[in-house]
Amino acid sequence: MKNLLICIIKMYRKYISPLKRPSCRFYPTCSQYSLEAIEKYGALKGTLISIKRILKCHPFNKGGYDPVK
């Protein structure tokens, strides 16, 4: 499951992300953050942490440096 999620994120980064203008308010980007979270915590916890981060990525949030802890 972990490898499948990583593959999906990498496909998103390669094929979908270049079609959109950059809009992530954080560093590392939400997709990179998701990759790191899934690698570090596994499929379930990493996905939950990633969803929480993606929900924070909106115009009303200041953003900034937010590494996987």
From Swiss-Prot:
Top-level taxon of origin = Bacteria
For this protein, the parts annotated as crossing the membrane are: none
Would the keyword Ribosomal protein be found if you checked this record's keyword annotation?
no
Localization (cell)? Cell membrane
Q: What is its main location?
A: membrane
Q: What does this protein do?
A: Could be involved in insertion of integral membrane proteins into the membrane.
Q: What is the membrane topology noted in the UniProt record heading this document?
A: Peripheral membrane protein
Q: Print the keywords alphabetically.
A: Cell membrane, Membrane
- Cite a GO CC annotation: plasma membrane
Keyword Membrane among UniProt keywords: yes
Give the similarity note: Belongs to the UPF0161 family.
NCBIfam families, A to Z: membrane protein insertion efficiency factor YidD (TIGR00278)
> How is this protein named in the record?
Putative membrane protein insertion efficiency factor
